[in-house]
Amino acid sequence: MAAEICIHNATVLNGFSTMKNCAVLIKKHKIIDVFNEDRFVKKTFKPDTTFIDAKGAYIAPGFIDTHIHGFGGFGTDDYKEESILKMSELLTEYGVTGFIPTLYSAPKENMINGINAIVSAMGKEKGAKILGIHLEGPFISPDRLGVQSPDSISPVDIDLMEQLWNASQGHIINMTVAPELKNMRELALYCISKGIVLQAGHTNATYSQMVEGMQARIFHVTHLFNAMSRMHHRDPGAVGAVFIHPELSCAVIADGIHINEDIVKFLVTCKSLDKIVLVTDALKPTKQRK
């Protein structure tokens, strides 16, 4: 890598504004300066600096995907370290710099094998960084399975949760649950003690059950609108709870297929942007090369 790289004639998204005709100076894989075209023209660079004309293209912080099962023909359901590492490598081609590999509900042995594979891959990445583990189950509603298998879900089971946690060596950071399940408060207390963020998803919860979930510190919602109780004027359900309570954050699969694009526009008029997380929920065949 050159001593310094300067990407100029770029549109920079810095999280606060859109900066046009800007340059970004990189040294040893780190951004050391961002400046406008006027400073770029006047600045004196080192003789071995490499210049790249972005031709107006965007430069933005890397994407972080908090809900992803697979990519490019590799997936968490392979239960293999090499599949997780391949996901890491391929995701960088699409601007992803960090991701949370997500496991569906599965028989205990498979879930533990999947957890072991992710833990084993951590620290060996050559691409996007593995930020932790997201368990999408097994404590979810049989009435809102989506594509998950009814044979793989489970009532709340603290002993099972402890086995999954121990296998993760402390790396489970998110878990999708159905707040209405019996003994959910007990599970929530356990997860709070471990620093696990609980998310309401694959849930048939009534509005009052969602409120009870919030009292148990379930403040995030998995793929809003998908696999959850709908909003109704007599019972707002899981969807309605997100719109009624500003403290609830939500993830959305904004691909125009899982939800209509105008629903996304509606959502951003109702929720603060810092309460909306874009996720892919991508599966193994996504961008698979033939």
Predicted segments, located by residue:
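Histidine-rich, glycine-flanked metal-binding segment
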Residues: 2-6, 12-60
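Residue-level marker for buried hydrophobic side chains located in beta-strands
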Residues: 6, 62-64, 199, 278-279
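Divalent metal-coordination and catalytic microenvironments
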Residues: 10, 24, 29, 56, ...
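Metal-associated gating/positioning segment near the N- to mid-region
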Residues: 57-110
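Active-site metal-binding loops of divalent metal-dependent hydrolases
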Residues: 68, 179-180, 203, 255-256, ...
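Short acidic/polar active-site loop segments enriched in Thr and Asp
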Residues: 97-98, 173, 219, 274
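Histidine/acidic-residue-rich, glycine-tolerant segments that coordinate divalent metal ions
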Residues: 109-236, 287
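Active-site-adjacent C-terminal substructures of enzyme catalytic domains
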Residues: 209-290
